Amino acid sequence: MQHPHPIDQPTYMPDVPFQPLWGQEAPPPPIVPYQELIAGFPCTDLSLWQRSQVTPLVPQRPSTNGRANGSSSSSKKTRRRVASMAQRRAANIRERRRMFNLNEAFDKLRRKVPTFAYEKRLSRIETLRLAITYIGFMAELLSGTPSNSHKSRSDVYGSMNGHHQAPPPAIHPHHLHPAAAYQRDFASPYNHSLS
């Protein structure tokens, strides 16, 4: 004799092993905005329909095996739970892809900004600060005019981390290597030298 699943124990989708959605050599599919996605549907203002207008269009399923409304409500809960699990998985995949792209972009930026060979891997904020300093240095080098705003710039960056530092010495930045400019403008939040 077969026993049906108890109502209080919902059935879940079995765990599906992670597989890439596309081949490693192919780029990921483009992300389509919601408005473009629903543009192909005949009626885009579905939210304007009232429930009383939509209800007659949806067929009512008769209860099977003479069960009461309790079983139909449990199947709705299971369906809703399965849908939410699928939505969570899709959101997790999107978040993983976003973080992967973000980390990849930071790695590319780290390869472009000048650093010392023996330096540890820069954090994201250190990478961004070094890139800002390097871009500023290169702009000053191209224009031939040194910037006189070093004090305000270091105060801004120091306060971003909650650390305050003494104003940098009056050195012309076009005489410095970009890595030296980085050391001049940004003190380590851990009170140790980056070199």
Curated annotation (Swiss-Prot):
Signal peptide, first to last residue: none
SMART domains linked: HLH
Protein keywords: DNA-binding, Nucleus, Repressor, Transcription, Transcription regulation
Compositionally biased region (Low complexity): 63-75
GO MF term list: DNA-binding transcription factor activity; DNA-binding transcription factor activity, RNA polymerase II-specific; protein dimerization activity; RNA polymerase II transcription regulatory region sequence-specific DNA binding
Cell compartment(s), UniProt: Nucleus
Listed PANTHER family: BASIC HELIX-LOOP-HELIX TRANSCRIPTION FACTOR, TWIST, FER3-LIKE PROTEIN
This protein's name: Protein Fer3
